[in-house]
Each structure stands twice: as structure tokens, then as C-alpha cells.
């Protein structure tokens, strides 16, 4: 059946500094960062309300014979409540220079922690079900995220997964082994899962095997199609995997 169990927000690249750089004031920038999660939560809640009220329409769409199978199954109680995941991109996404596929060895872990804490707090104000840290290129940034998540005043106890960008079947983009990263995540209670994204599909199987040797936490996998990315032109090239 078509449908989704998790709705992901569009805040991957959203930061207060980024919006201010586009000319928005501080308060406007803060609200725009939060809006990415707010809209996803709102859409999910409208769907739940329509189901609870037995509504025949959802945001103007008639629920009838042409209704997607996933919606039908949910309406009949066969699917769980959809979750909202707040997409939280890496420092490299803010830089917009492709460094989320290389790492940033000259940037200290403490600086990365300071980068993540305020935007994490803003996302959490909108009460997503889970935080999805994505395309994390390095062990250092994963440590910074783990520290930020360990502060209950920042994370509000919301669980998270960390998904890494990987350069091959055994290493994250900055060169550390996925095993080292998974070992760390296994010990951090607020991080409930580990993932792989923005990675060539042929690397996924060995990465999963490596992760599973050191942790039983859930693994999320959503790799690239198989094309290559040109960070200078910001375009994809090559053939997608079948």
C-alpha cells in the first residue's frame, strides 16, 4: 500500500543565521526555522482530525474510490499514527559547499555543538515525534549532536536518529569507521537509532553489517539513487541504480 509512516519536515538546511543572511530579521528567522516542523505537525494533525470525524474530504481531496491505499488502510485502523520527523541537517548544509560529503577537520566539536543547540531547541518547540539528523559526515559532529541531545532542556526528551553520509562500505565521509560511530551512538540514550543516507547504494549492505556488529539499535537506510553529485554545480550526473 502506498503511504508513509513518517512525515519529514523541510528544515534540513534551515538556520537562523541562514535566514538572516537572506535579509530576514531575527524574530522572522526564528519563526521560519520553527515553521518547517510546525507545518508537518499541522498536516499530520489535520489528517488525524479528518479520520476521527469521518470526514469525506482531506484538505480538499475527496476520500473515495481514488483514495490512495495507504490512506484507506489508515482510515480503517490498519496503519499506525504517522510520525513527524524534524529533519536536522549538518553544519555542512548550512555552509552549502558540499562539505557534508567530506567533513570539516578544522572545525572543533565544541563549535559544532554550539551550532546545533539553538536550532535543535527551536525544532523541539514544535514537538516533533523524532529528530532526524541527516548526512552527518563525521564522528566529531555526531559527538556534538549527542552532547546537544543529552541536554533535556534542549531536546525535551524527544528521541533521535543520526544518519551518516559514507564514502565507502566501512567509513563515514570524513574517514572514521562507521563502527566507531555506531559504538558511540549505542551508548547515548537519547539517540535511539543510526542511519545511512546520501550514500551510494552499493555501500549500504556492508555498512549495515558493520553497524550491527556493535549495536542492536534500529537502522534507518535511505541512500542515493546511485548517481554522483557535483558539489560545484550542485547537480547530479550518471545513471541511477535499478
Q: Which ranges hold each PLM region?
A:
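Domain-level signal for soluble alpha/beta catalytic cores
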Residues: 1-242
